[in-house]
Amino acid sequence: MIENYIQLNKSSILRLGIKTDEGIDTGEFLEFNLEDIELPLRFQELLEKDKKNKEHLRNQMLMIDKREDVKGKKLMSKNEEDKIKAINEFFKKEVEVYNMFLGEKGVEKLLNGRKLGWTSLQEIDEIITKQIAPHLDLKMTNITDKIKNKYGEAIQRNKEVLKDE
């Protein structure tokens, strides 16, 4: 019985381990294929949706501030309660956007069992911009150069073959 195996090159895989607040490795990680053709599009979509979500939250807060406030039946006034609900909705949308980029349950991995808190999104944003984005090399010129380097010879040979005909 002959068994053959193949293995793809993993040199373009960025794997980021996750540690607890105490610095203990959780065994969880985020993984990015730096040659994924859709990665630049997902990163761009993350930035666009993040901007859209923040604008929507800002508009909601402005509308709430313009309304007359009414004393609530509980601890908060009606406007305060509506602001908390708007922020909660914003957080849920942002988690969806971040998971679209980080991968399934990416936010949960980063939170390490903690619940989403007031500063969690800011922490995740810093992780993406300072620790992940610099590795992505998402500029179109870099992508074009990689394609030319990888397929340039084949393209040149095809041009020469076509000229001979």
What residue spans do the PLM features occupy?
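C-terminal charged interaction modules
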Residues: 92-165
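Extended, low-complexity, charge-balanced
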Residues: 7-17, 21, 84-88, 95-105
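Short linear sequence motifs
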Residues: 25, 36, 83, 91-94, ...
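Structured domain cores in non-transmembrane regions
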Residues: 53-78
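Long, compositionally biased intrinsically disordered regulatory segments in eukaryotic proteins
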Residues: 3-4, 32-36, 65, 75, ...
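Generic alpha-helical secondary structure signal
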Residues: 41, 81, 85, 105, ...
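Short, charged/polar N-terminal "headpieces" of proteins
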Residues: 1-62, 149, 153-158, 164-165
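Intrinsically disordered, low-complexity acidic Ser/Thr-rich regulatory segments
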Residues: 72-93
